[in-house]
Amino acid sequence: MTVTIYHNPACGTSRNTLAMIRNAGIEPTVVEYLKNPPSRAELEAMIAAAGLTVRQAIREKGTPFAELGLGDPSRSDEELLDAMLEHPILINRPFVVAPLGTRLCRPSEVVLDILPDTHKGPFSKEDGEAVLDAGGKRIV
């Protein structure tokens, strides 16, 4: 199974998502999107496949969102995409692309919806929150 995660190693949600993928016995393709951003076509395809609008896929916190005036509702999807490609930190994360679907995995356990049920035992997030029980079954 080919799974790709658009990952930011500085983000706890992204790290937890990556760990859950690996807990399912899958070694994903890891794209550090701040260093290697997706193309416009890839970004548009991910957003559409996840069932999101461009505005729903943009990250506000810790980004130049406000200073670029991206909260203005008159800004078009094209303008938002341009900003996301120029400033990849504006791309919300982590996006995961898998044969079972594409999701923006916030919260991280959303990734479980698009992974096979092959989890190995219990799993807890970095903060200690239990996500999978000893049998690999979802708790949350």
From Swiss-Prot:
EC class: oxidoreductase
Residue(s) at site: Important for activity. Involved in arsenate binding and transition-state stabilization: R59, R93, R106
Gene Ontology molecular functions: arsenate reductase (glutaredoxin) activity
SUPFAM superfamilies: Thioredoxin-like (SSF52833)
EC numbers on record: 1.20.4.1
Cited Pfam families: ArsC (PF03960)
Catalysed reaction, written as an equation: [glutaredoxin]-dithiol + arsenate + glutathione + H(+) = glutathionyl-S-S-[glutaredoxin] + arsenite + H2O
Active site: C11
Matching InterPro entries: Arsenate_reductase (IPR006659), Arsenate_reductase-like (IPR006660), Thioredoxin-like_sf (IPR036249)
Keywords on record: Arsenical resistance, Oxidoreductase
Keyword Ubl conjugation: no
Gene disruption phenotype: Disruption mutant shows selective sensitivity to arsenate. Does not affect sensitivity to antimonate [Sb(V)].
Domain of life the protein comes from: Bacteria
Transmembrane segments: none
Residues flagged as site, Important for activity. Lowers pKa of the active site Cys: H7
PROSITE patterns: ARSC
One Gene Ontology biological process: response to arsenic-containing substance
PANTHER family reported for this sequence: ARSENATE REDUCTASE (PTHR30041), ARSENATE REDUCTASE-RELATED (PTHR30041:SF5)
Protein name: Arsenate reductase
Organism expressing this protein natively: Rhizobium meliloti (strain 1021) (Ensifer meliloti)
Lineage start: Bacteria, Pseudomonadati, Pseudomonadota, Alphaproteobacteria, Hyphomicrobiales
